[in-house]
Amino acid sequence: MTTSKTHIMILGSGFGALTAVREIRKKKVRARITVVSPNNHLTYLPSLIWMPSGLRSAADIDVDLTKFFAREQVDWLKGQVVNVRDEGRTVDVETDRETIVVTNDVLIIATGGRYLKKLPGLAEHAIIPCEGATKGQLIHDRIRDMEGGTIAMGFGTNPKEPQAVRGGPMFEFLFGIDTMLRQQGRRDKFRLVFFNGSDRPGQRLGPKAVDGLLREMWKRDISVHIGAKPLRIEADRIVTEREEIPADLVLFMSGLTGPLWLDNTDLPRSSGGFIQADEKCRVVGWPKTYVVGDTGSYPGPEWLAKQAHQADLQAEAAVANIVDELAGREPSHNFKAELICIVDSVNKGILVFRNHKMALTLPKCRVFHWAKRFFERHYLKAYRN
């Protein structure tokens, strides 16, 4: 289909990037693949929610990609992306020794986003759980060492791009910590608080899901403070537009924006700071340059996610369009917009599914918890074996 001289460069080594590698090989594209990332490990972030309870450790959710890269004949370049130039054909990479220039024929950008830290006191007085396994372990250790007190959990968004939010995991941390404390016989010593600036938190999951999540909080005796924007986080409290909420431990998932290196480029940007893409995951105005996952801003429904499963779907579409281009055809594959989420609580889960045809929410049951664990094992098998 293509010559072996075709060089496909992938920036990042997360969900979207690795799915792109697999799809390229699955479609038998005869191309050299170079992956650029700071390390050759995958952290399975969806399972971070099990770290506070000890159901998962950092080692459990870490995958060494050395064998995967060797099997898929991938050249891995350890480094940080500094710049992308020449409409995607040139990438500047900062390695341990120097900044090098790497050229390509096709580029896939999948470096992820970064959490906004503009909320005063966030960096000093709160933990952003999904920043990595070290934060998951920190949450575990902090709660283990507490004899009681108030744990407050909430999330925010990017006001210029409301889709750039990680609400689902915060519901899982909330319910999971509640379950853990009950299993430990310590729940009566703790006050759990959920706070959010919206009066309908988690709207991306659908109205029925929001109702169900709020109902679950009330059932679990979780104090709900919604509809007032957080103004700052202090050492012992959250200050909102309406009130002050005392807290001994704060977990807060802020909204996301694009990675810092984008500021060095001429890549088209959305108002929220992401790379502007079309429905085929093409970077607008940059030929043979694609973006998948959290780094991009895409057309689609207001509930469109960008991470994990959706990043996989975008990577599949991007590679299908690359195959078209290399064969001299017009790219014809739009990415599928689909949201699948199991809101887990350590021993049970609530299933949420959305696409352009339907929105489905199924009540909590043990089957969904085990389904989430099965999917974790199935997903990681491709990279561990």
Region roles according to the model:
Residues 165-167, 295-337, 341-344:
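A conserved FAD-binding loop/helix module that cradles the flavin
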Residues 347-385:
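C-terminal auxiliary extensions adjacent to catalytic cores
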Residues 124-147, 237, 244-249, 253-313:
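FAD-site-proximal beta/loop scaffold in flavoenzymes
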Residues 161-178, 207-212, 307-316, 344-354:
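Short, electropositive alpha-helical surface patch
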Residues 16, 112-115, 256-258:
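Short glycine-rich anion-binding loops that position phosphate/pyrophosphate groups of nucleotides
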Residues 2-6, 73-172, 176-185, 251:
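FAD-binding core/adjacent interface of flavoenzyme oxidoreductases
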Residues 30-34, 71-91, 102, 178-276, ...:
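A Rossmann-like FAD-binding core segment of flavoenzymes
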Residues 2-75, 161-203:
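Beta1-alpha1 glycine-rich phosphate/pyrophosphate-binding loop at the start
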